[in-house]
Amino acid sequence: MGNLVAIVGRPNVGKSTLFNRLTKTRQAIVNEQAGTTRDRQYGKSEWVGHEFSVVDTGGWVVNSDDVFEEEIRKQVSLAIDEADVILFVVDVVNGVTDLDMAVASILRRTKKPVIMVANKTDNNELQYNAAEFYKLGLGDPYCISALSGSGTGELLDLVVGKFSKEGEELLDEDIPRFAVVGRPNAGKSSIINAFIGEDRNIVTEIAGTTRDSIYTRYEKFGFDFYLVDTAGIRKKNKVSEDLEYYSVIRSIRSIENSDVCILMLDATRGIEGQDLNIFSLIQRNQKGLVVVVNKWDLVENKNAKVMKTYEEAIRSRLAPFVDFPIIFASALTKQRIFKVLETAKEVYQARTTRIPTARLNEEMLPLIEAYPPPSNKGKYIKIKYCTQLPNTQVPSFVFFANLPQYVKEPYKRFLENKIREKWNLSGTPINIFIRQK
């Protein structure tokens, strides 16, 4: 189970700069293709063999310069709920403020590890100023400069040292892990209740290393599966989810710990920006996807044409990834609930598909010969062989070419589409690599 590090603090203390430093990104370099610019608030980091996720909880706040104490309190409460380690960023140039005091008063009550990061410490004189932050009662202020990177290596040593040393969950790897995700009021709780019904369907609860219950195993309708973080979805949330970044951050852990994500959409509202944010997280983590259009019972004049219009709109918004199942369901009336689980299991099986090398070459090489990669500066690109890589999270294929550097993304998409035409890989991402033969 991955660890989650949350960055909190009042506006303008350098949270975004620290986030960019830890995730080795710059805000100017953000992939806009996913249909959202909010990806920059969530990233992956790795330090001395430890992989973890980083969230800038303030990053989802619009006009963050105008954030008041109550908004900061919500962010910090969210971090306490969701994170394994909390980085509380303060500004040594401006010193202790009332908002810093307010944040510290909340953090002092948590049992989660809190590291106070004294940012903008660019010289020795400012290091002396950091002593002022002892009054916040959170231990030693850790001096860094997020802008120059000074002190961030030692900070990362401290962060990974705070991660739980307990063993990982003892999960049966052959049993699929499903996560139900979506924006507030899309019907997550309703569909989970429809899946599992009464508590007697619970087989085992496996305690997470840092959570009350991350995985719960169920046997229902002839299926054997884990639901990820259902306790978190079913409990009454301490933090209101009226603002979209709350539910997006809450989705991170569920997505990371799943094999297949069941993305709930509200049929009465269509696909919205928040749905795109969650879809982007699913894509970046390379998880299987089943889209469920819930509350289908509330749609009037339902027919095949209306259904087709919905499908086209969803695939258009989620492009370029369009090969995923869409199910029109009602958690309330239990319409097609069985179909949702059945499809999620099929997507899980697609993720583990193995295609024999001989068969792959037999199908793909004639296509490549008929439609070769475009030549580059008069040089012809030849692909002679392909194979599926072993032991990968999702189906991954390598094509060996004489000039791999000239094979561009559109041709990789062509290869992916042809593989999808030949084999049923609906719902699972696949990777295409071009290597020197």
UniProtKB/Swiss-Prot annotation:
Instruction: Kindly indicate whether the keyword tRNA-binding belongs to this entry.
Output: no
Citing just one GO molecular function, the answer is: ribosome binding
Query: What sequence ranges are listed for the domain KH-like?
Result: 353-437
CDD domains per UniProt:
EngA1, EngA2
> Taking every annotated instance into account, which residue ranges of this chain make up the domain EngA-type G?
3-167, 176-352
InterPro entries, alphabetized: G_ENGA, GTP-bd, GTPase_Der, KH_dom-like, KH_dom-like_a/b, P-loop_NTPase, Small_GTP-bd
One GO biological process this protein is involved in is:
ribosome biogenesis
Family label: Belongs to the TRAFAC class TrmE-Era-EngA-EngB-Septin-like GTPase superfamily. EngA (Der) GTPase family.
Q: What does this protein do?
A: GTPase that plays an essential role in the late steps of ribosome biogenesis.
Give the protein name, as stated in the record: GTPase Der
The organism is: Phocaeicola vulgatus (strain ATCC 8482 / DSM 1447 / JCM 5826 / CCUG 4940 / NBRC 14291 / NCTC 11154)
- What is the name of the gene encoding this protein? der
